[in-house]
C-alpha cells in the first residue's frame, strides 16, 4: 500500500479501545500499530500477532507479510502519530513537564505534582500499577508515549491536564517522546550510569540534552552544577538557573530549605 489515512478505516469505539503497540498486548480483535528497523524482528512480531487473531496490523513497508490483515503504509510515521488523536483526542491541549537527570527525577516530580495541584499526574519509575491494564510490556521509567496517551484517554484520567514525566536517557535517545511538547523541562544532575547502553558519559549527556532542544521543550530549569551549566551552554531555549548564587534566576538557600522542612 502507499499512503494511508486512518479516517478511511472508520474505526469503531471498540476498535480504538483495542489499539495496541506491541505484539505482547495483542488479543483477538486488537488493532496493532507496529514498526521496527530490523525486518526479521518486525516480521516475527507480525506473525505472532496474526496467530493471536489480531483484527488488523498497521505497519511500514519494512514488513514482508502479505496477509490480508496487514496494511503497509508508506507514511507509517505520520499514521502512527495520527493514532494518538484516537487514543486521547485532547492530548495536544494538555501541559507536559519533563524531568531528567541521574538522580532526583522521582522526588522532583512528586514535589511538582503537589505544586501544580489536583489536575496533575506524575508518571515515572514507581507508577507501574498505572499501566498494568494498558500493556504487558515491562514497565519503563519513561513508558511509550502511545501507552501514556492510552492511559490519559481513559475516563478516569481525563481530568488530568498537567502531565509530569520522568524523561530517562533511554527514552530520549530512542525519541520516545516524539509527538508531544514539554511546556517546561528540568535538569537535576548527571553522574556515571547506564554505560551498558550509552558506553560513556558524553553519550549519556547528549541523550539527556535532547530534552532541551527546540523540538521537545519551550523552556527549562536547571541546577547550578557542572552538567547543568553544560546544558545551558548547549541549549538555546529560555532557561532558569537554581543556585545559591544571588545572581541566579531562582535562589536556593539553606534557610529556605530549613523553613520548608519545619
Predicted ranges, named:
Residues 162-170:
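Switch II (G3) loop of P-loop NTPases
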Residues 59, 63-68, 158-161, 173, ...:
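Acidic, Mg2+-coordinating active-site environments of NTP-dependent enzymes
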Residues 86-128:
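Walker A (P-loop) phosphate-binding motif
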Residues 171-177:
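Conserved helix/coil segment N-terminal to the catalytic DExD/H
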Residues 1-82, 86, 262:
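N-terminal leader/targeting and accessory segments in enzymes
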Residues 128-144:
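P-loop NTPase switch/communication element
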Amino acid at each position: 500500500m502507499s499512503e494511508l489515512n486512518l479516517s478511511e478505516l472508520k474505526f469503531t469505539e471498540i476498535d480504538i479501545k483495542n489499539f495496541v503497540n506491541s505484539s505482547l498486548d495483542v488479543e483477538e480483535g486488537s488493532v496493532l500499530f507496529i514498526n521496527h528497523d530490523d525486518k526479521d524482528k518486525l516480521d516475527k512480531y507480525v506473525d505472532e500477532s496474526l496467530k493471536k487473531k489480531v483484527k488488523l496490523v498497521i505497519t511500514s513497508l519494512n514488513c514482508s507479510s502479505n496477509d490480508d490483515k496487514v496494511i503497509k503504509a508508506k507514511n507509517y510515521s505520520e499514521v502512527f502519530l495520527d493514532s494518538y488523536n484516537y487514543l486521547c483526542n485532547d492530548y495536544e491541549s494538555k501541559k507536559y513537564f519533563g524531568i531528567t537527570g541521574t538522580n532526583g527525577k522521582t522526588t522532583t516530580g512528586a514535589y511538582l505534582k503537589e505544586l501544580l495541584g489536583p489536575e496533575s499526574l506524575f508518571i515515572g519509575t514507581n507508577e507501574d500499577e498505572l499501566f498494568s491494564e494498558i500493556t504487558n510490556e515491562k514497565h519503563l521509567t519513561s513508558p511509550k508515549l502511545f501507552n501514556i496517551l492510552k492511559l490519559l484517554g481513559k475516563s478516569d484520567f481525563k481530568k488530568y491536564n498537567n502531565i509530569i514525566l520522568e524523561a530517562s536517557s533511554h527514552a530520549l535517545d530512542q525519541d520516545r517522546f516524539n509527538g508531544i511538547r514539554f511546556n517546561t523541562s528540568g535538569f537535576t544532575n548527571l553522574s556515571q550510569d547506564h554505560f551498558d547502553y550509552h558506553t560513556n558519559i558524553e553519550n549519556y549527556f547528549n541523550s539527556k540534552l535532547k530534552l532541551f532542544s527546540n523540538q521537545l521543550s519551550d523552556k527549562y530549569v536547571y541546577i547550578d552544577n557542572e552538567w547543568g551549566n553544560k546544558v545551558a551552554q548547549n541549549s538555546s531555549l529560555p532557561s532558569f538557573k537554581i543556585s545559591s548564587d544571588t545572581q541566579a534566576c531562582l535562589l536556593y538557600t539553606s534557610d529556605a530549605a530549613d523553613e520548608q522542612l519545619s
